[in-house]
Design a protein with these regions (language model features):
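Ferredoxin-reductase
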Residues: 203-294, 310, 335-338, 346-348, ...
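Juxtamembrane helix-capping/reentrant segments at transmembrane boundaries
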Residues: 66-70
């Protein structure tokens, strides 16, 4: 689905409850009261839409890109939080105490029934906690699967609490039409969560894989290869990624996103370049051959297939080489006539992976800690290095594919924009958003 259509669909779904509230509501209230209700309605609708912006739905993420999907997910969560925080304060001057006999439409008052308000208060306290935890998760000592569990359960709990609060405490939510809409939207959102954590694992169970190779390719970096068990494998484009689960139940939360470093043209086996970092990856080299594995994917739009630019520029930092290596391998195996250049940055020489395979032609190695007699580039991947590597025509006509540390990508993207590289020729993948 194309980005403009996705944007229109998002706006339509989020504003649907607001529009219906205006159509089915009673006599208008004071502006600050209507604003309070409107912000609350928008906040709830946006929170429900967060479930389908999780990045696990290919119709969305594979067309607009995983980076755009997750950044939009984060941005909308923060805006929804802002709306939710403001919502109760705009009612401060509204008479309370519940409905009056002469005010059957609840035009003049708001409820003080604690049974109706308590769920809203609970959600009001949980929502900022969940958002702040997501923002700071990389700085907290949480295992990845623990954070995923907290995030998923927390989001589900907030949705259920807000549904009760909206239907029973809200002036508009109590209308039969609005109640039906909120029930349907909440049901679809919760259903999307069940699909990701129940239906997908069931489907994956019928398409198991097994580990065929675990090879060290550089300091603390490994290549893990898996082969399909009794099925044809995975259809994917070079540069995409999957959620990889090794040695666990399909329902386990111990799965991680890894870019595919092999090429589709190489056959059904799939390889991943994985760095020892923490949780599952710190023991990656100890995986035994034959261990069962499950793949959910492919995801992502970091692909140069079907593009028409005359050249491809691959810019990688560290383990960010993985998807770019898949692209390079595919181009070499298929005899792709397009020109290609690779810039590959690392801290030290022992971190350079696949050096023999990559070779020297049209490959620029960059080290921030260069040893004696180092012949390649030194320092970091920056503007001057890019200017030495690419011509003016290449900046404007080639497609640039980036993957690596956020700081490196920020520097490279800024310089490419300064050199008039069109945004549609700039593909990037971060896997880190805060």
């Amino acid at each position: 689905m194309k980005p403009p259509i996705l944007i229109i669909c998002y706006i339509a779904v989020v504003t649907l409850p607001l529009a219906l509230s205006w159509l089915v509501g009673g006599p208008p209230r004071a502006f600050h009261q209507e604003l309070a209700s409107g912000l609350g309605i928008l906040a709830f609708a946006m929170i429900l839409m967060e479930f389908v912006l999780s990045g696990r739905f290919k119709t969305i993420s594979n067309d607009i890109g995983m980076d755009v999907t997750m950044r939009f997910h984060q941005m909308m969560a923060r805006i929804a939080l802002g709306f939710a925080v403001l919502h109760p304060f705009l009612y401060l001057s509204t008479p309370s105490g519940g409905q009056r006999p002469w005010d059957t439409t609840r035009q003049l008052t708001i409820t003080t029934d604690i049974s109706d308000l308590s769920t809203g208060i609970a959600a009001y306290l949980l929502l900022p906690s969940l958002v702040l935890l997501a923002i700071g998760r990389t700085k907290l000592d949480f295992k990845y699967e623990t954070w995923r569990l907290i995030h998923g359960v927390g989001a589900l709990l907030i949705a259920v609490l807000l549904l009760h609060h909206t239907v029973y405490a809200g002036r508009y939510g109590s209308q039969p039409v609005m109640t039906a809409v909120w029930l349907a939207m909440t049901g679809l959102s919760v259903g999307s969560l069940c699909y990701v954590y129940l239906v997908v694992p069931l489907l994956d169970k019928a398409r198991a894989w097994h580990v065929t190779s675990v090879v060290r390719v550089a300091s603390k970096q490994w290549e893990v290869t898996v082969a399909p068990d009794g099925h044809s494998g995975l259809i994917y484009d070079a540069g995409q990624f999957v959620w990889l689960n090794v040695g666990n139940s399909t329902f386990s939360l111990r799965e991680n996103p890894f870019s595919i470093s092999s090429a589709p043209a190489a056959g059904p086996e799939i390889s991943f370049m994985i760095k020892e970092y923490g949780d599952f990856t710190q023991n990656i080299g100890q995986i035994k051959l034959g261990t069962v594995a499950y793949l959910d994917g492919p995801y992502g739009s970091l692909s140069v297939e079907r593009r028409t630019e005359p050249g491809v520029a691959l810019i990688a930092g560290g383990v960010g080489l993985a998807p770019l290596l898949g692209i390079l391998r595919q181009m070499r195996l298929t005899g792709d006539p397009r020109k290609v250049k690779l810039i590959y940055g690392n801290r030290s020489v022992d971190q350079i992976a696949y050096r023999d395979e990559l070779g020297l032609e049209d490959v620029t190695y960059v080290l921030s800690e260069q040893p004696e007699a180092w012949q390649g580039e030194t320092g970091f991947i920056d503007g001057p290095l890019l200017d030495r590597t690419f011509s003016r025509e290449e900046f404007t006509e080639w497609v640039f594919v980036l993957c690596g540390p956020p700081l490196m990508m920020d520097v490279v993207e800024d310089h490419l924009i300064m050199r008039d590289t069109p945004s549609h020729r700039l593909l990037s993948e971060r896997f880190s958003y805060d």
